[in-house]
């Protein structure tokens, strides 16, 4: 049986994602880091960026976050974000709206234009692959 992590991404407005995933990549304050099942316990601040995760069905999804905290243990990853936008939708217009909202969220969180461009480019690339 495949090992999975329970991922929860929550904002003050409610849950953004809750489900089983194979892996998670997070924009940590000290740099991007990945989490697999069995990871050591960890607490970290999150910078503005994208959380990328592979769902149990193999599909990769992204969530843009402005900042937050993450608690990792061997079986779960709990993200508490100030703001987050799930990148996805059933149509190109929904995906374009999510990308625009993510860009706004990131621009409000940081004035580092290089970081914003990098994250938005990654989000756009992933969104194109999901349609």
From Swiss-Prot:
Transmembrane segments: none
UniProt keyword terms in alphabetical order: ATP synthesis, Cell inner membrane, Cell membrane, CF(1), Hydrogen ion transport, Ion transport, Membrane, Transport
Primary location: membrane
SUPFAM superfamilies attached to this UniProt entry: Epsilon subunit of F1F0-ATP synthase N-terminal domain
InterPro entries: ATP_synth_F1_dsu/esu, ATP_synth_F1_dsu/esu_N, ATPsynth_dsu/esu_N
Coiled coil regions in record: none
GO CC annotation: plasma membrane; proton-transporting ATP synthase complex
Location(s), subcellular: Cell inner membrane
Entry's Gene Ontology molecular function annotations: ATP binding; proton-transporting ATP synthase activity, rotational mechanism
Pfam family membership, one: ATP-synt_DE_N
Biological function: Produces ATP from ADP in the presence of a proton gradient across the membrane.
Family per similarity comment: Belongs to the ATPase epsilon chain family.
Subunit structure: F-type ATPases have 2 components, CF(1) - the catalytic core - and CF(0) - the membrane proton channel. CF(1) has five subunits: alpha(3), beta(3), gamma(1), delta(1), epsilon(1). CF(0) has three main subunits: a, b and c.
NCBIfam families, per the entry: ATP_synt_epsi (TIGR01216)
Entry protein name: ATP synthase epsilon chain
Top-level taxonomy: Bacteria, Pseudomonadati, Campylobacterota, Epsilonproteobacteria, Campylobacterales
Underlying gene: atpC
């Amino acid at each position: 049986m495949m090992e999975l992590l329970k991922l929860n991404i929550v904002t003050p407005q409610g849950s953004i994602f809750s489900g089983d995933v194979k892996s998670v990549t997070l924009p940590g304050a000290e740099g991007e880091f990945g989490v697999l099942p069995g990871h050591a316990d960890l607490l970290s601040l999150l910078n503005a960026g994208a959380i990328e995760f592979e769902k149990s069905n193999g599909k990769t999804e992204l969530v843009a976050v402005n900042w937050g905290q993450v608690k990792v243990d061997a079986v779960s990853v709990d993200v508490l974000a100030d703001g987050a936008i799930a990148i996805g939708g059933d149509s190109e217009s929904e995906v374009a709206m999510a990308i625009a909202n993510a860009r706004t969220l990131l621009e409000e969180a940081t004035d580092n234009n290089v970081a914003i461009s990098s994250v938005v480019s990654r989000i756009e690339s992933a969104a194109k692959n999901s349609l």
